[in-house]
Amino acid sequence: MMNESYFSYKDIYIEDGRKVLEVNMLPEKYCNFDCVFCPIGRSQHKTDVQRSFPGTDNSIVELENNINALNPDLIFINSKGEALLNDRIDDIIDLIKANGKAVRLFTNGYLLGRSEYMKIANRCDEVVGELKVLSEEDFQRLQRPIEGYTLAEYISNMAAFRRQYAGRFIFEITIIKGCSDGPGSIEKLKDIIREISPDKIIVAKINDKRFEKKFSITDERLEEISRALLDI
């Protein structure tokens, strides 16, 4: 049926003493990037314009039923692509807030510099932005963004958002072998962290088995970089 719910959920988990319900609110991958190492695969729809999807009304009803049944403390919007591209995201945030729950939004972060998307993200209690590469060449080659996007603008968009955001901004840095693990990478990353000034930093590596050999680093190197970045 075209109008069936398309939201999908992960099992409830506990994080820092809070019950978290993680929800995907896109029927397919709609994203402004097409990263070669994306665990979801290629972007079927490469866009930075909001879309309307059949079945959203039923999906929102299902979300409310799940909130009532599971009673989470936090709803984590973590979608197949860029969640901001669902044109009903405001209604979804309204529903979560009306039920007295906190909202965390995961976004790649590029759209946070645009006023219409900044306004939406500002309504969330927590926003997670991310960074994976440190050069323009790697950004274009590996993250394959929409034409005209630049790494400098990507970083400045997150920094601009953070400067005016009253909530908790979490900055997730994924270290990519050969791109952000080299000798000069730590200082570059420290400069970016200072520019964005997040409330929390998460340092991660590629864990998807399909991409580990080409893009992942050792646990030891991850620990080394994490210690350096968290000590600023």
Residue ranges and their predicted role:
Residues 84-215:
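Conserved AdoMet/S-adenosylmethionine-binding subsite of the radical SAM
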Residues 22-24, 39, 74-78, 104-106:
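Short, conserved beta-strand segments within well-ordered enzyme catalytic domains
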Residues 41-76, 87-91:
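Conserved alpha-helical substructure of the radical SAM core
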Residues 2-22:
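Short, charged low-complexity linear segments at domain edges
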Residues 16-58:
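Canonical Radical SAM [4Fe-4S] cluster-binding loop centered on the CxxxCxxC motif
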Residues 171, 211-232:
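Short acidic, glycine/proline-enriched helix-loop-strand junctions
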Residues 38-43, 71-74, 134-138, 169-170:
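Short, basic/glycine-rich phosphate-binding loops at helix/coil junctions
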